[in-house]
Curated annotation (Swiss-Prot):
UniProt-annotated location(s): Cell projection, Cilium; Cytoplasm, Cytoskeleton, Cilium axoneme
Keywords, comma-separated and alphabetical: Cell projection, Cytoplasm, Cytoskeleton, Repeat, TPR repeat
Coiled coil: none
Ranges for the TPR repeats: 11-44, 46-78, 79-112, 273-309, 318-351, 358-391, 395-428, 435-468
GO biological process: one example: heart development
Keyword hit for Phosphoprotein: no
Disulfide bridges in this chain: none
Region annotation Disordered: where it falls in the sequence: 511-624
Protein's name in the database: Outer dynein arm-docking complex subunit 4
Phenotype when the gene is knocked out: Heterozygous intercrosses reveal deviation from the Mendelian distribution, with only 6 homozygous out of 53 born mice, suggesting increased death in utero. Most surviving homozygous mice present with small body size, some with hydrocephalus at the age of 2 weeks. They display a variety of left-right body asymmetry defects, including reversal of lung lobation or dextrocardia. At the cell level, the trachea and fallopian tubes of mutant animals show absence of outer dynein arms from the ciliary axonemes, and consequently severe reduction of cilia beating.
Organism: Mus musculus (Mouse)
Amino acid sequence: MSDGDILRSTFPSYMAEGERLYLCGEFTKAIQSFTNALHLQSGDKNCLVARSKCYLKMGDLEKSLNDAEASLRNDPTFCKGILQKAETLYTMGDFEFALVFYHRGYKLRPDREFKVGIQKAQEAINNSVGSPSSIKLENKGDLSFLSKQAESKKAQQKHLPIKQLSYSTKHEIKRKGSLKSEKTVRQLLGELYVDKEYLEKLLLDEDLIKGTIKSGLTVEDLIMTGINYLDTRSNFWRQQKPIYARERDRKLMQEKWLRDRKRSPSQTAHYILKSLEDIDMLLTSGSADGSLQKAEKVLKKVLEWNQEEVPNKDELVGNLYSCIGNAQIELGQMVAALQSHRKDLEIAKEHDLPDAKSRALDNIGRVFARVGKFQQAIDTWEEKIPLAKTTLEKTWLFHEIGRCYLELDQAWQAQSYGEKSQQYAEEEGDLEWQLNASVLVAQAQVKLRDFESAVNNFEKALERAKLVHNNEAQQAIISALDDANKGIIEELKKTNYREILREKAERQDIMSQMDLQGASEKEPLRGREEQERVVKQWERDQESEREATDDEQDRKSSGGLSKKLLGDGHSSNLGIRRESREIYRRLSDYSSHLPSEDGSQKQEKKQAEAAKGEVQKLEKTKEE
């Protein structure tokens, strides 16, 4: 990879791209993306685990194991790395070593993945005990995991008295063991029995067992830890029984053939049972292509047989179609997988096989959900509801239906099914499903903007996550809780903002009304003030005229003017008074005809100016 390629993107971008390609089944491209990410951030344990998963899907088991071990190099307690190493070892056929790491991870964090891993590893070991040649266990002679286990428990084992861990001879070890014979021990341990013998021989070397290792433990303590572990595992494997339904179904099928034919299983029956085991083993080990080819080959042969040779031929054919469909899902052949599972469903309906019908509906719903057709998945799974028998099955079913409704943004239905799943999970007492159901309900309530209820359910989910020690779920829930709380704050802000806007609008309306009322009251007031000012000016002018007239009359009387002139002067004075009265009358009319509350101030101004003009005119006339 060139420097230019490295700089073109970032570590999170390559990680996201790799995860998307992994989900799409493009494992080669996903590996390249994860490799690019590791160039940017060397040794990132999450990236190494992600690339290991891709190698495992492609069947490159050595590279898958190398990446898983590399993820544990700096942090031996990294649970994802432990789980991935266990899965890789299981796929490689090292069931005992896989079981060791499943148990180690379960002690660190009791998650469902480790629990299921323990169960399937136990079943694989039990299935191999009957015929050890069916599974080849690789005897690497590497007991380093025992020393690591001892070192990790230094605080607990360091101060234990050696007498509690020691046995004097090889014969005492055998007497203390719970197994009845060496033959049984050899059969249960398989090729690990060689390691047990080797450890027992080491105990005979007195000089060796007195030595100590860096952690402070003696070699004898370390050897006895390994022997005790193998003894415990032997008892455990001997007592355990197969748990998966497929094993029970195969045995029930064999018993049915025995009842129908009333004779020992024929070569045909052995062939079918062995073939079903091989098909299932190939699929679980990551070889979906091999599983598909095997199932198609067996189906072709079974279809050639008659009903007498295989009494439950129809049930077997449906089972094979189901196996073919499951392999096609893993290969990404969704259309073909849907056809195969529908054939399984048709056979189940035709021959009234409720368990087979439930299985087919389950698988058809899975196909629809994988391709994003959530409504069809809902319809299919809702048809399966009456066939669900156990509380745990109902819990899972309602959760998946609710998840599909959530994907369709139908939050009410998602909440309803989530609450049903929550109820059945509580009845079952399964903390993992209580966690899943609570998260589903909370997510639906967030979409419904019921943030308060969502916070309550997220808090409930957080409690369950703490109880099952799921740190990743805790972090995700805490983040979702923060978002829900922010949603509550935003809702409060929006509510307050709407209240503020409404109050502001109301205040503006009130102020506008007050302004209009004040303006209307001021307009006539201005008119009256102007009128009074003009009238007062006119009265002052009249007073001046009267004084001037009186002075003139006095002068004329003293000057011996004629009566005619006196009469003319009086007439002139009367004329002036008439004009004054006319002006006063016009002013009175003006006062009575003042504009109403909605009149304009400009018009009042013009009328006042006109009145002033009349007064000035009168003054000029008087002077003349």
